Structure formats: C-alpha cells, structure tokens
Amino acid sequence: MIQHPRIGIRPTIDGRRQGVRESLEVQTMNMAKSVADLISSTLKYPDGEPVECVISPSTIGRVPEAAASHELFKKSNVCATITVTPCWCYGSETMDMSPDIPHAIWGFNGTERPGAVYLAAVLASHAQKGIPAFGIYGRDVQEANDTDIPEDVKEKLLRYARAALATGLMRDTAYLSMGSVSMGIGGSIVNPDFFQEYLGMRNESVDMTEFTRRMDRGIYDPEEFERAMVWVKEHIKEGVDRNREDLILSKEEKEKQWEFVIKMFMIGRDLMVGNPRLAELGFEEEAVGHHALVAGFQGQRQWTDHFPNGDFMETFLNTQFDWNGIRKPFVFATENDSLNGVSMLFNYLLTNTPQIFADVRTYWSPEAVERVTGYTLEGRAAAGFLHLINSGSCTLDGTGQATRDGKPVMKPFWELDESEVQAMLENTDFPPANREYFRGGGFSTRFLTKGDMPVTMVRLNLLKGVGPVLQIAEGYTLELPEDVHHTLDNRTDSGWPTTWFAPRLTGKGAFKSVYDVMNNWGANHGAITYGHIGADLITLASMLRIPVNMHNVPEEDIFRPKNWSLFGTEDLESADYRACQLLGPLHK
C-alpha cells in the first residue's frame, strides 16, 4: 500500500546543556505538537483522510540529532519539513539540507528567547546553500508560556502545508496520454522533461486503439457495464438533437452510442488507476493501470471523425459521482492538453475539489452585450466578462448545484450528498454531439454554471528559453438574465457547458480591464477551480520554481521562500523570474 506523503516537524533547540537546553525542551516540543495538531485537524488528503505529520524523535540541538531526524523522515515518506523553535539554535548545524523538498521555519516571536534571531540566521544559511526555505514570524510578540499559534502564523503554516503536500502527491506518479497531439494544440505536445524535472512525474502513453481493443476483447467489467446502462437510462437526460436532419442518428444508433461512451468511461478510468476486477476476469496486466494522477484524451480528430467523442468519459471522470456512487474525481484533460491538465491538477491538490476545463472563448464588452441584447451590464459584470465553454465536456460539479450555507459551491466529495447529485443531474442534459465537428457522434454535456461563486482561473504555459510560467486570475462566476444568456450562448454552440466569468480587476497590468485579461491569457484553455486560491498557487509555484507572469493576488498575501527577497523587493514579478531561473526545477 502506498503511503500518504507526510509533513515532517522539526523542533530545534539551543544545544547548550546544564540548564539552557533543559529549560526549553517542553516548550520546543509543544510547539512541534501544536503545529502537527493544526495541520492534521485542518487539512485533508484527496481521499478525505486527515493529513499526517511526523515529529522528529527528539529536539534538534546538534548535527547528530538533525541526521537522526533526516533518517526518520526518509523512512516516513516526508515530502516537506517545518522547523519550529522558540529560541536561539545553531543555524547550519540544525537545518534540514534536503535539496529536493520544501522547507519552512517558524521562529517564535517572544522577547525572553531569540527565536527570531535563529530564524534570520538559519534562513541566511539556506540562502547561502541554495536550499530555499519559507520564513514564518508572527506579527505580535507572545508571552513565553503562550501555546497558541497566532492567526497570521496559522495562515502561513497552512498555506505552506497545502502547497508542500501538492508537491508530494505529484511525485512519482504519471501523466497518461491517451492518444497524441490534438489539432496542433501546443499543450498536447507533451514535454517529458517538464514533468520529470519540475513535478517529479513520469509520462506514459497509450494509443487510442487501446479503447477499441478493450471493447472488442471484453476487457472491462461486464457486470458494471450492465449496472451503468440501467443508471444512465434512469438518470441521464438526452438533450435536443440540433444536428442537420441528414446527420441525425436513429434511436437504435444512439442506443449503441450510449453503450460505446459508457465503455469509454470505464476503460479510461481503468487505464488511469487500474481495476482489480479485470484480474478476476483474466486480464492481470490491464488490471494494474498506469498509476496516473492526471490524464488526457486526444479525441480530435482521428478518433472523433470515426468514433463517438470523449465528452461523456471526460465529464464523468472529472465529476465526483457515477453509477457506483459518490467518489473523489479524476483529473482529466480534453484534447490531451497536458498543460491544462497540470493546471487542473495544481488546483485539485490545493482544494480537493473537481475542476472545470474550458476554452477561454470570448471577451464580451459591455458595449457588445448591449448592442447584441439591449441589456446594460451591472454589478460584477459591469466591466464585461469572459465566456468559458468547453467543446462538449465538463465536470457536473461545475453546475454549482452543490451548496454550503445556502450558496453555490464546488466542494470535496466527502461533503457531497445525494440531493446535490440529483440537482446536478437535473440541471444538465446530454445532447447528441454536433456531427459537423464530431463526425463519429457521441453526447455533449450541457449546463449553465450558477453565478456568484468565487473562482480562480489558472493556466500553465511553456516558454522556450524560460520553461513553465503560470497565470492566475481570481474572480466570480456570473448569472446573467435568462434571455441575455440564451442570446449570447446561442451564438456559440448551445449544446456545450457554459460558465460566465468576471475576473477581479486591479487597475494595472494585465488586470486593467477584462479585455486585458483575455488579451494576456497564454493559451486557448484554462482550468477553473472553486475559491480564491491564487495565493496558494503562488506558494506552490515557488516550491516548483515556476515563475508567475500574471496574477491579481494582493501583495500582502504572497508567500514565497525568504531568499526570493534577496532577488529584489520592489518588483516581485522580476524577482520571481530570477529566483526560479537561478535555482532551477525542484527535481532536476
């Protein structure tokens, strides 16, 4: 059984015996325990289990104790460390020198002992040795016997832990390409060096004929297939067929297509993570899967010109339920856009929530909306908005039909209930695919995302000579008047899933206007997650050494390793590029 990645907690202490060290043992170890309790009681893994921490076997005052801690962490699948101390310690003697995992240090802000002095000293050693570390120092002085973690310290500890766990969860997993390059899209030109050096992941690939091989040879669970067919007939609403009359399939042909796309879902899932049932059926090799944390399906055009498209498969892999019940989502990219798949993966690992994959299709200015509909935009939509619409697939969680405190949300699977599942299904239909585009047919996913959800749109791009760069746009989904929505939606393909999105503007740079956001977006796709998580993404990007070229996160929320400030404090964007370029990828 594969262990969860863990956070290692390192209590460091003044090594002087005969009074000094002894007086600090309890306070120092209690700091470590309080950090471990905070993380384990607040954060969860994608499977819903509490995050696990490992505390060093003793306080760390000298090199042998640092080495013992390091050995324990190596055996315990520790993916990141947090060093805590209320006092002076010996900097380079007590630091963790592992170069390939993130590090953070919390120096207690108290006057009796110089925890802040150690923090500054050890961060200087980290900078000298080229091993980045995050510095955490509370804003307010605490009493020496105060065991509470201040709110500002909690925020940084949790932001660091979320991002660090994401690096550990990615490591030693795979991106699985089902097919190859789709329609010349750059993101589907999969770059194995990026995956290996920045994420610690490997790449695997199968030809799309693997789907037909498994169908023809019965390499799927026939009992599950029968159960799925019953469930689909009971719960899935087939939408209006908008095809030309000569392209409309017969009822019998559509029935066959439903059977086909259900098998596609089952095979796509089994390819990613395996299925023990296949071994029982005599297919031991196929039963193990590809250990894929994220995958993509090429589809267009070689597959979709002949076979039903992948929309149903993609939709339900990214959704948190199917005929087997509520479960965690998969991360699955349309058109094998690996870079948008990774963007979705970053979002997912930071939030444990399913992701919207969308084309960043259109900027609608207030003037254009008024000209076309006669409606004057107001509220969050007043400056215009973006039409986010994928070509036929999207997680059903993207409907916004789940709620928390009466408001629409996308939430982890362990919070989802059956009434919310039913609401998602009732507010979605599955029209036959547009056969002018998808000659082989299939079924698209059609819904409208509810408005007023805080969301973050993300995109990873590759820039020759630089490497990966990340873009982040926080904002809100919108709910337009029904007639306005229909007028605008019908100008595209109204059989596809739509999200209206207004990024939060700052009045400068790429966020001077909604038009500037669209104009500076680096690719045709974006990954959209529930919540404003831009600050967490910036922290994660710094751990992976990926510079952020565009974001609208308030400066006070930016949390990067301390040595980033040594690259400059006025122009943080340029300093980020220089730091990432000098340090290089995390796993190189």
From Swiss-Prot:
It comes from the Bacteria. Its cofactor is Mn(2+). CDD domains: L-fucose_isomerase (cd03556). One of its GO terms (biological process) is D-arabinose catabolic process. Keywords: Carbohydrate metabolism, Cytoplasm, Fucose metabolism, Isomerase, Manganese, Metal-binding. It catalyses: L-fucose = L-fuculose. It is found in: Cytoplasm. Its EC number is 5.3.1.25. SUPFAM superfamilies: FucI/AraA C-terminal domain-like, FucI/AraA N-terminal and middle domains. GO terms for cellular component: cytoplasm. InterPro entries: Fuc/Ara_isomerase_C (IPR004216), Fuc_iso_dom3_sf (IPR038393), Fuc_isomerase_C (IPR015888), Fucose_iso_dom1_sf (IPR038391), Fucose_iso_N1 (IPR012888), Fucose_isomerase (IPR005763), Fucose_isomerase_dom2_sf (IPR038392), Fucose_isomerase_N/cen_sf (IPR009015). Coiled coil: none annotated. Mn(2+) binds at E335, D359, H525. The active site is at E335 (proton acceptor), D359 (proton acceptor). It holds the Pfam family Fucose_iso_C. GO terms for molecular function: arabinose isomerase activity; L-fucose isomerase activity; manganese ion binding. Pathway: Carbohydrate degradation; L-fucose degradation; L-lactaldehyde and glycerone phosphate from L-fucose: step 1/3. NCBIfam families: fucI, PRK10991.1. Converts the aldose L-fucose into the corresponding ketose L-fuculose. Belongs to the L-fucose isomerase family. This is L-fucose isomerase. It comes from Streptococcus pneumoniae (strain JJA).
